[in-house]
Amino acid sequence: MYEKIEGGSVIDIQGLKCNLPPEGYVFNIITKQVEFRGVYKRSEIQSEQYWKRIPLPSWYLDTMKKWDEFDKKKKDDEVEFYDEKLEEYKKQEWDRRLNGFWYMNNGEPTFLTGLHYLYLQWWPIDIGYPKFRIPDIEKFYFMEYCIQDPLCMGMLEVTKRRFGKSFVAGLFVSEYITRTKMTNGGIQSKTGSDAKKFFAKTVVNPFRRLPKFFRPEYDMSLGVNPKTEMRFQRQT
């Protein structure tokens, strides 16, 4: 969003010139290259082209159950569970989480940042999974620009109630620290009690419902539903 991308487009969000990759392409943050991924379509009929959570593969639930059963019996020195189809699916979803995702929206190719894709596809809120909204896509573009701008110290958001900002904030504080070593995230609220409620509702509950391949191990000595902190380390 911050750096210009050759062949891409620019959209102005509240004065920030956000740089989108060319249609069907993403900037791979690992290879540092612009790479083709294509544009996902849920239908060839334009009126049916809108965001809807992408269905899980037919084999997914059964394979995840086998993984859980394997881990319950596995000893520390044994090899990890492996399933070829699951590995490909994990790579796909990690790629979308890190690099973004294109899909067709009423005939218009639409780019979601990786954080926005994770929010829509995998981050449950109090009424199910989030819906796609234009103000949200602009917010995630703006947020990604701020993250990438080396001179930016943060952003301020002023909005009305019931606009989903709490769950987006919960995702924001969780996403980076769940994939980065030696990293902390914090929550500040009106009171300590309010912060605990926010933590339980917008961090712990959605985190526990993430797929296993997005969910690092955490210290269970604080409970399955910790009240004040999550430590991403194995319990000894």
Predicted regions mapped to residue ranges:
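Phosphate/NTP-binding elements of NTP-utilizing enzymes
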Residues: 1-236
